[in-house]
C-alpha cells in the first residue's frame, strides 16, 4: 500500500543496520504492533536512469504478487514522496546474510548447515516459480540468516521479473552467480535461479564460487567453459549426494537442469536432518 510519506507518524526510527546502493536500512518500531521492523529508505535523487527507477519499483510490486512464505522476507508497508521511498519489511535480527555467515564461520560452512540453508532457499524459489516469478539475483548477500532459529529468508527482489508464461531476457544478476544462458544473451526462464542457487550452495561448502576471474568478463568466460570441479582440498569431506545435486543444478543444459521441486526431492535434501556437522 503506497501512501504519502507518513512513516514517522507510524514508526519510530532506530539505528541504521545496513546500507545499499540507493539508501539505508534502519531498524524501526511500531507502537501499534509493539514489534520491530526493517525500513529500507531510498533517496530517489540518487537514481541515475530509468533502469535504477525500475529496480526500486520492482521489489514492492513483485513481492505484493507473492503469497507469504516462511523463507521469503515480507513487506508490510510502503511510503512514498517525490524524493523518497520507504519500504517497511520483516526484520531479521541481528541482520546477517549468508555472506556474513561465511565470514564469521571462517570462509565455509559445514555440510549440515549448508544443506539446511539450501533446502530453505530452494523452498523459497519453488514458491516464487509457482507464482511465475524469477528472482534473477540469488546470491549469498540476498539471503538473510537467523542464527537463533536456523531459518533463512530470500530478500532483495529488485531484479525480479514476472514471466506471465513467457521467457525473460537481459543480463541481470551478479557475475559469479549468473547462468550461462544469461551470459550468452539468450531468452531464459526460472531455471536461471537454480543455477544461481547451486553456485550459492557450492560457495557455502567450498568457501568460494566454482567459476572465478579477476574481471566480470573473465568470470563469464569461466562460466561458459562450464568445467564444474570439486577440488579434494575443498570437497574431500563433502558427501557424494551433495556433489550430485550440485551437478544437476549447475548444469549448462537447461533442459537437464533441475527445477526447484526436483532439487527438493533429491536425496541430499530429503536427508537434511540426518547430516552430521563436519
Curated annotation (Swiss-Prot):
SMART domains: S_TKc. SUPFAM superfamilies: Protein kinase-like (PK-like). This is Phosphoenolpyruvate carboxylase kinase 2. It comes from Arabidopsis thaliana (Mouse-ear cress). GO terms for molecular function: ATP binding; protein serine kinase activity; protein serine/threonine kinase activity. The keyword ATP-binding applies. Expressed in flowers and roots, and at lower levels in cauline leaves. Barely detectable in rosette leaves and stems. The gene is PPCK2. Belongs to the protein kinase superfamily. Ser/Thr protein kinase family. Calcium-independent kinase involved in light-dependent phosphoenolpyruvate carboxylase phosphorylation. ATP binds at residues 17-25, 40. Keywords: ATP-binding, Kinase, Nucleotide-binding, Pyruvate, Serine/threonine-protein kinase, Transferase. Lacks the autoinhibitory region and EF hands found in calcium-dependent protein kinases. It comes from the Eukaryota. The active site is at residue 137. Induction: Up-regulated by light, cycloheximide, phosphate starvation, carbon availability and high pH. Down-regulated by phosphate and phosphite. Very high sensitivity to phosphate at low pH. Not under circadian control and not affected by nitrogen supply. Residues 11-269 form the Protein kinase domain. Its EC number is 2.7.11.1. It catalyses: L-seryl-[protein] + ATP = O-phospho-L-seryl-[protein] + ADP + H(+); L-threonyl-[protein] + ATP = O-phospho-L-threonyl-[protein] + ADP + H(+).
Amino acid at each position: 500500500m503506497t501512501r504519502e510519506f507518513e512513516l514517522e507518524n507510524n514508526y519510530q526510527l532506530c539505528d541504521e543496520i545496513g546500507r545499499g546502493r540507493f539508501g539505508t536500512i534502519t531498524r524501526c518500531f511500531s507502537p501499534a504492533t509493539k514489534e520491530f521492523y526493517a525500513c529500507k529508505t531510498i533517496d530517489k535523487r540518487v537514481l541515475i536512469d530509468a533502469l535504477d527507477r525500475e529496480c526500486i519499483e520492482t521489489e514492492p510490486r513483485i513481492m505484493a504478487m507473492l503469497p507469504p512464505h516462511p523463507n521469503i522476507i515480507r513487506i508490510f508497508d510502503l511510503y512514498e514522496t517525490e524524493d523518497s521511498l520507504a519500504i517497511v519489511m520483516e526484520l531479521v535480527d541481528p541482520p546477517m546474510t549468508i555472506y556474513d555467515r561465511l565470514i564469521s564461520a571462517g570462509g565455509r560452512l559445514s555440510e549440515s548447515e549448508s544443506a539446511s540453508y539450501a533446502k530453505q532457499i530452494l523452498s523459497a524459489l519453488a514458491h516464487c516459480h509457482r507464482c511465475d516469478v524469477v528472482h534473477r539475483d540469488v546470491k549469498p548477500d540476498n539471503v538473510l540468516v537467523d542464527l537463533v532459529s536456523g531459518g533463512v529468508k530470500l530478500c532483495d527482489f529488485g531484479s525480479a521479473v514476472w514471466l506471465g508464461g513467457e521467457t525473460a531476457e537481459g543480463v541481470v544478476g551478479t557475475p559469479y552467480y549468473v547462468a550461462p544462458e544469461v551470459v550468452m544473451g539468450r531468452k531464459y526462464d526460472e531455471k536461471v535461479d537454480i543455477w544461481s542457487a547451486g553456485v550459492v550452495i557450492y560457495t557455502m561448502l567450498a568457501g568460494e564460487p566454482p567459476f572465478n576471474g579477476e574481471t566480470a568478463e573473465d568470470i563469464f568466460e569461466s562460466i561458459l567453459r562450464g568445467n564444474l570441479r570439486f577440488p579434494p582440498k575443498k570437497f574431500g569431506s563433502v558427501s557424494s549426494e551433495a556433489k550430485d545435486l550440485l551437478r544437476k543444478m549447475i548444469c549448462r543444459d537447461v533442459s537437464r537442469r533441475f527445477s526447484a521441486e526436483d532439487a527438493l526431492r533429491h536425496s541430499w535434501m530429503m536427508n537434511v536432518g540426518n547430516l552430521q556437522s563436519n
